[in-house]
Amino acid sequence: MKPSIYRFPLAIQMVLPDDYRHNQAFNQELKLLQHYGFTGIELNIANIEAVNLDDIQRFLNAYDLVLTMFASGLTAKTHGLSLSSPDVTIRSRSVAACHQFIDLLQGRHIGIIIGFLKGGPAKDAARAKTDFRDSMRQIAVHAQAKKVHVIIEATNRYESCVANTVEETARMVDDLDNPYLHILPDTFHMNIEEIDANTALRTHQDKFISVHISDNNRHYPGLGAIDFHPVFQTLAAMDYNGPVVIEGNLRKDFSADIHASMAYLTTVLKKEPDV
């Protein structure tokens, strides 16, 4: 990965178009990321088994980008997957899909994000938590065997009834005791679930290798009300060296939103001068 010009490597989550090499809009978006010094990208891919990951990485390399994570949300939506579903058939199919993801990513230094794939709100939240834990136990064993990192995103209660807070997610990772299992803090979700996001980050700093950043309104950083400077100070104080990853909804369009967000982020993410 190209050295970052920022305090932390800067990445973004996007959807991979089927015609990514010939999609002019997508190529222009990647050029803009290159201009601003992004070094990593997480990709939502509807059917990961149908793509050529080597070709995707070669394509991204032309824009100084490395594929760091497979974001499984689009796949889960496309195929109706849920790791906490009360339907054992759906859960089994979802676990099998995760095993397939792991097999495809083995040896590529690409992790898997489990967010939407956790499953949505449920009438029986206690059962959903138990079922999700059982699903993750099976996935974690396969992940360790194949040496592929799996990251569970702490998402708010309105999107899922499992792994909502950073603490809850970290506790489950502790219980499963697997070096290839991590948590994924996200500033949007923390703004809803945490009493103090910075305390949550400090307390569980040994459990995450990536941080998602989006504003309180789910737009890109700088387009809402969150002050990201204390967040980045907290990460710097703990010697965090992983990526910070923009994941959010568009307010206007990609170009306008990236320009606006980077006008803010280039200030709060700038490297401190050597002393």
Which residues are covered by each model-predicted region?
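N-terminal pre-domain/capping segments
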Residues: M1-Q100, Q106, N178, M262-V275
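Histidine-acidic metal/acid-base catalytic patches
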Residues: M1-Q34, A163, E167-P185, H189-V275
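Structural preference for beta-strand elements that scaffold enzyme active sites
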Residues: R7-A11, G40-E42, D64-M69, H109-I113, ...
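Active-site-proximal loop/turn and secondary-structure-junction residues that shape catalytic pockets
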Residues: L16-D18, I45-N47, G73-L74, K118-G120, ...
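Active-site acidic/histidine proton-transfer and metal-coordination neighborhood
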Residues: Q24, S84-H182
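Alpha-helical scaffolding segments of alpha/beta enzyme cores, especially the outer helices
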Residues: Q28-L32, D54-R58, A62, R93-G107, ...
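Short Asp/Glu-rich motifs
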Residues: N52-L53, H79, D124-A125, V162, ...
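Short, basic/glycine-rich phosphate-binding loops at helix/coil junctions
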Residues: A76-G80, G111-K118, V211-H212
